[in-house]
């Protein structure tokens, strides 16, 4: 079977508009970044709605198909935006076969899910490649996780990095990738 993974589509409000109701701007960035990461790296076909990475707004209108360009336009120059985060996620998805398993048997064989009340952690295995651990932090509570010696942080929620870590303090929502 196949899946199309998405956070928003042309119907109803944009994710930015929905989150704007109850969140500060920096929290909106963190949450959309987390959502984009899950959408891109989850098995299946990612669908990114036009302007989602640019924090597109339809100014709270649900169905805007019959409204003007003032409502439906994409602000290509909006700062801040998540364009670089999206590019980095696509690089990671293409670099590591861990995120492209197609068969249920492979998913069952090569993925290990660990969940606590603070974070979700998924260990990805791939023959001939280093093990990856994806950690999903879902809130702003601080949580420290310890790692085996030699572990490297390769994605910090927004950027591709290469930092050796023995422990990491998660302080905001995000998807983080570690390599052993």
Model-identified regions with their sequence ranges:
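Carbohydrate-interacting/catalytic domains
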Residues: 26-29, 38-48, 52-180
């Amino acid at each position: 079977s196949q899946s199309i993974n998405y956070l928003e589509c042309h119907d109803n409000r944009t994710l930015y508009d929905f989150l704007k109701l109850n969140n500060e701007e920096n929290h909106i960035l963190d949450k959309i970044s987390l959502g984009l990461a899950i959408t891109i790296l989850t098995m299946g076909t990612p669908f990114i709605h036009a302007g989602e990475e640019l924090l597109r707004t339809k100014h709270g209108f649900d169905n805007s198909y019959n409204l003007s360009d003032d409502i439906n336009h994409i602000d290509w120059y909006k700062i801040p935006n998540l364009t670089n985060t999206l590019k980095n996620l696509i690089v990671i998805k293409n670099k590591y076969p861990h995120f492209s398993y197609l068969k249920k048997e492979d998913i069952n064989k090569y993925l290990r899910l660990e969940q606590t009340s603070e974070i979700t952690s998924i260990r990805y295995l791939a023959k001939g490649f280093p093990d990856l651990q994806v950690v999903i932090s879902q809130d702003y509570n601080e949580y420290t996780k310890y790692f085996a010696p030699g572990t490297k942080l390769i994605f910090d929620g927004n950027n591709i990095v290469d930092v050796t870590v023995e422990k990491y303090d998660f302080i905001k929502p995000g998807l983080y990738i570690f390599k052993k």
